[in-house]
Amino acid sequence: MNLHEYQAKQLFARYGLPAPTGYACTTPREAEEAASKIGAGPWVVKCQVHAGGRGKAGGVKVVNSKEDIRAFAENWLGKRLVTYQTDASGQPVNQILVEAATDIDKELYLGAVVDRGTRRVVFMASTEGGVEIEKVAEETPHLIHKMALDPLTGPQPYQGRELAFKLGLTGKQVGQFTKIFMGLATLFLERDLALVEINPLVVTKQGDLVCLDGKLTADGNALFRQSDLREMRDPSQEDSREAHAAQWELNYVALEGNIGCMVNGAGLAMGTMDIVKLSGGQPANFLDVGGGATKERVTEAFKIILSDDAVKAVFVNIFGGIVRCDLIADGIIGAVAEVGVNVPVVVRLEGNNAELGARKLADSGLNIIAATSLSDAAQRVVAAAEGK
């Protein structure tokens, strides 16, 4: 789950990380009042969306008057910001962050992720701040310095000092960086984060370190014990179908094809998309209904898949292990009848009571095609999507 920049900076403040004074505003009037609270300009105004590349898209601007702040807010609030990280429709701008401008001398990068290879939280620091870290990793990987946290001892001040020296910091900056490192590591661990980035972490012309931007991603599997982070969720920034799926504990990711896929099990779902591609089709989504493929969940899954106007056929691929295939077939028949599916549905059942399930599908009288194998199902659904 992603957080907005202003939410990230609220958390930074709780953990003692320095950031510019700022306020999130939902109206042009609030934006003007925020400037008065901050004090004399210049100010920086930023559209709050879950995407990078805001500056290049006009979503970040340095302004010198309250009139300019109002004009920026009037121009963006209620609109959609399109960046290289969004789709063509962009993401809605519901808040504007107004904060004090900072005199920048140097831009650095500091971030942390969970490294699955080492099974550790790994910090990354670089002198190449203000640009995408992926670009730095590709073009100048030697400029990225890494530091893994020991899960037994946690973050240690000496690790912060070591990174500070590698970044060329001196004097009081070493102490400031170490404090930021320790605070960020504590935030990462206590809040069950999956990713945190300060890009850029700037050195001001006065020689102080300031967190100029912030990006946080919380581990969705840990939100049950992070109630305050759950309340920060902004559904408006999510794909509506993905948000609907999350309510039913369905794992859904929208893609750009025309064949809807409904599968039980993430591995089987990925394999299903592969064989659809191999057969000449284009998957419209990844959807894992999980082990509990009940009629209710299958019904909601159909609703989600069919809300995509690009879908021309649906491929249901179910392996019956603990759950019997005849019961799954009953759920599919009930869901198709209830939702009113008007595109071909190809179903492949394998496992416990698969033959009985296939007979039920064939006798249902609905627009359901029972396939005999995985390859047969893939070929049938690709042909159906092409209108053959």
From Swiss-Prot:
Substrate binds at N264, G321, I322, V323. It catalyses: succinate + ATP + CoA = succinyl-CoA + ADP + phosphate; GTP + succinate + CoA = succinyl-CoA + GDP + phosphate. Its cofactor is Mg(2+). ATP binds at K46, G53, R54, G55, E99, T102, E107. GO terms for cellular component: cytosol; succinate-CoA ligase complex. Pathway: Carbohydrate metabolism; tricarboxylic acid cycle; succinate from succinyl-CoA (ligase route): step 1/1. Mg(2+) binds at N199, D213. It comes from the Bacteria. One of its GO terms (biological process) is tricarboxylic acid cycle. Its EC number is 6.2.1.5. Succinyl-CoA synthetase functions in the citric acid cycle (TCA), coupling the hydrolysis of succinyl-CoA to the synthesis of either ATP or GTP and thus represents the only step of substrate-level phosphorylation in the TCA. The beta subunit provides nucleotide specificity of the enzyme and binds the substrate succinate, while the binding sites for coenzyme A and phosphate are found in the alpha subunit. Heterotetramer of two alpha and two beta subunits. This is Succinate--CoA ligase [ADP-forming] subunit beta. It comes from Erwinia tasmaniensis (strain DSM 17950 / CFBP 7177 / CIP 109463 / NCPPB 4357 / Et1/99). The lineage of its organism: Bacteria, Pseudomonadati, Pseudomonadota, Gammaproteobacteria, Enterobacterales.
